[in-house]
Amino acid sequence: MSPEGNSAALACLNVLGTAFSEPPLKVYLKSIEGDEVIDNHPAQVLLDNPNPNMTANLMNNYIVTSVAVYGDAFILKLKNDAGGVVQLIPLLPEMVEVKGNNEQLITKYQYKQKGNTLEIMLSLIHI
């Protein structure tokens, strides 16, 4: 089901996504003296610039809209050779299938696009 056919639903999603994405997400260091913003932390750099094609506002808007429409948001963590996360790539929720078994609720994710299936194990943020 898509909100494009309902202008009221689309307007509500627009307000939600915009309102959520306006305040910036920050990384803090907690200490006895108080919380301190760490601007140069790798997680902060990633939150500010999730990937070359998206701003932080666009990524946050995607998360809110996906959760409101589909109940889930999926973000692929692209890693460098050292294992550090260097990009966050949003995945279309309708193309992600959550797999589990009797022992584990979630064992893997499958992303299906254009007839291809990509199995994703640990490199996904599921909201």
Q: Predicted segment positions?
A:
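Structured, contiguous alpha/beta core segments that scaffold functional sites
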Residues: 1-126
